[in-house]
From Swiss-Prot:
Organism of this sequence: Chlamydia trachomatis serovar D (strain ATCC VR-885 / DSM 19411 / UW-3/Cx)
Subunit structure: Part of the 50S ribosomal subunit.
Protein name per UniProt: Large ribosomal subunit protein uL13
Classification via Gene3D superfamilies: Ribosomal protein L13
Function: This protein is one of the early assembly proteins of the 50S ribosomal subunit, although it is not seen to bind rRNA by itself. It is important during the early stages of 50S assembly.
Entry annotated with the keyword Transmembrane helix: no
PANTHER family found in the cross-reference section: LARGE RIBOSOMAL SUBUNIT PROTEIN UL13M, RIBOSOMAL PROTEIN L13
Gene Ontology cellular component annotations, sorted alphabetically: cytosolic large ribosomal subunit; ribosome
Family assignment from sequence similarity: Belongs to the universal ribosomal protein uL13 family.
NCBIfam families: rplM_bact
Keyword NADP: no
Any one GO MF annotation of this record: mRNA binding
Gene Ontology BP, a term: negative regulation of translation
Length: 150
């Protein structure tokens, strides 16, 4: 922490990635938007007392059971993801049902990415997100993640 002499505001210095805490969040039965906003808060560091908007001080998040996330209302049948191939007439639309079957991690990553800053800082924070299909996160046991009931 650094205290400036001309103001009462205390600013945090850039934190070291080695001291980053990791959290495990189970997406099973959770609503996509509510889950994504909680994950985005942790990635930004807003859960910390020393939160500073321009500093990458967030923690890492591992989301498991990505394929079991749910949507409310008729969105499961109506939600569509758009992407452009780069060719003429290359606009593609993929319904949520197909996307969750083919790439369940993309659904959560896309939602969280929309809730982070659209800057270098947001891209850096996205690197601390891991989304896994299934309930096993054995490859991340070495970092001793904390299981959240968020």
């Amino acid at each position: 922490m650094e205290k400036r002499k001309d103001t009462k505001t205390t600013l945090a210095k850039a934190s070291d990635d080695r001291n980053k805490a990791w959290y495990v969040v189970n997406a099973e039965g959770k609503t996509l938007g509510r889950l994504s906003s909680e994950v985005a808060k942790i990635l930004r560091g807003k859960h910390k007392v020393t939160f500073t908007p321009h500093v990458a001080m967030g923690d890492g998040v591992i989301v498991i059971n990505a394929e079991k996330v749910r949507l409310t209302g008729a969105k499961r049948a109506q939600k569509v993801y758009h992407y452009y191939t780069g060719f003429i007439s290359g606009m593609r639309e993929v319904p949520f049902e197909n996307m969750i079957a083919r790439k369940p991690a993309y659904v959560i990553e896309h939602a969280v990415k929309g809730m982070l800053p659209k800057t270098k800082l947001g891209r850096r924070q996205m690197k601390s997100l891991r989304v896994l299909k299934g309930s096993s996160y054995a490859q991340y046991e070495a970092i001793k993640p904390i299981v959240l009931d968020a």
